[in-house]
């Protein structure tokens, strides 16, 4: 892994992959936080390769109790979950609803919310309820059987990662002082897929209560530090469904696209 400050040229076809974990093999002239040989994790460029480049401010030292494979499953999803919960002003004792609780971001959101002292309900498919409970959820809802946003139960914070529920329904399920945080658009939580609802939420929040907002996730080492503390304390751990060697990266992506993954899929080098 090479740590670089900037670059003027980039290849026409970029190597995919953002979350990385590995050993530093070279550093840029202005890098002060890392040296060659350090074990690091974070967000980089071209992670699906033997070597990847990353900005210094997007890396942190790898948690001591994780393997590189485990650490690679943390950066993007866990930081997104942490930022979403913070944006929702999470506090101990609150009731939190995580929609899409069995995915990469959702699984971390369940664990982090529990670590913050919240009472957590996770929405997922019937096949994944046991998995979500194993992450610490106090209650699970099978979205195919039970209405989870009909106003019969209210929450202090709703973190919506699945992106399919109408805003009016989510509003009815919030306490008057509660917050809705939308992570991603309407296309399976993809941040670039279907931004209409995500953009409407903060506009509606100007005129109505409760608070509706969307998350614009940012990658920075400042969020990796509290995550490392939670991980090393045993309060948060990566859930890895499968690992693939680099030459089977396409198979890994196909498994993700199938929508059956519990947690994360990792590519090893």
Language-model features: where?
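Short, well-ordered loop/turn sites that connect or cap secondary structure elements
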Residues: 34-35, 90, 174
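A short acidic, Gly/Pro-enriched loop at the edge of an enzyme's catalytic core
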Residues: 149-157
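A structural motif shared across PLP-dependent enzymes of the aminotransferase-like
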Residues: 44-56
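Glycine-rich phosphate-binding loop and adjacent beta-alpha segment
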Residues: 161, 165-236, 269
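Short glycine-centered segments of the SAM/dcSAM-binding site in methyltransferase folds
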Residues: 39, 95, 119, 178-179, ...
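Mid-domain Rossmann-like dinucleotide-binding core that forms the NAD(H)/NADP(H) cofactor-binding site
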Residues: 72-142
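Glycine-rich beta-strand-centered segment in the early N-terminal region that forms part
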Residues: 1-46, 161
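C-terminal capping/lid region of NAD(P)-dependent oxidoreductase domains
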Residues: 228, 235-242, 250-269
């Amino acid at each position: 892994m090479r740590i670089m400050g900037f670059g003027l040229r980039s290849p026409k076809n970029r190597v995919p992959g953002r979350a990385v974990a590995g050993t530093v093999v070279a550093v840029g002239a202005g890098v002060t936080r890392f040296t060659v040989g350090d074990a690091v994790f974070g967000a980089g460029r071209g992670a699906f390769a033997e070597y990847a480049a990353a900005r210094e401010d997007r890396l942190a030292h790898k948690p001591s109790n994780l393997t590189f494979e485990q650490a690679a499953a943390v950066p993007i999803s866990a930081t997104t979950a942490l930022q979403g919960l913070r944006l929702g002003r999470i506090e101990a004792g609150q009731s939190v609803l995580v929609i899409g609780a069995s995915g990469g971001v959702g699984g971390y959101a369940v664990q982090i919310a529990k670590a913050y002292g919240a009472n957590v309900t996770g929405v997922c498919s019937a096949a994944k309820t046991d998995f979500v409970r194993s992450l610490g959820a106090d209650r699970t809802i099978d979205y195919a059987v039970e209405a989870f946003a009909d106003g019969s139960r209210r929450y202090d914070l709703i973190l919506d990662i699945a992106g399919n529920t109408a805003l009016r329904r989510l509003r009815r399920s919030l306490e008057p002082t509660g917050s809705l945080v939308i992570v991603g658009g309407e296309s399976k939580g993809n941040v670039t897929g279907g931004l209409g609802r995500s953009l409407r939420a903060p506009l509606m929040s100007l005129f109505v209560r409760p608070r509706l907002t969307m998350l614009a996730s940012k990658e920075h080492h400042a969020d990796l530090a509290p995550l490392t503390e939670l991980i090393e304390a045993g309060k948060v751990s990566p859930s890895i469904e499968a690992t693939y060697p680099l030459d089977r990266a396409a198979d890994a992506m196909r498994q993700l696209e199938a929508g059956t993954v519990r947690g994360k899929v990792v590519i090893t080098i």
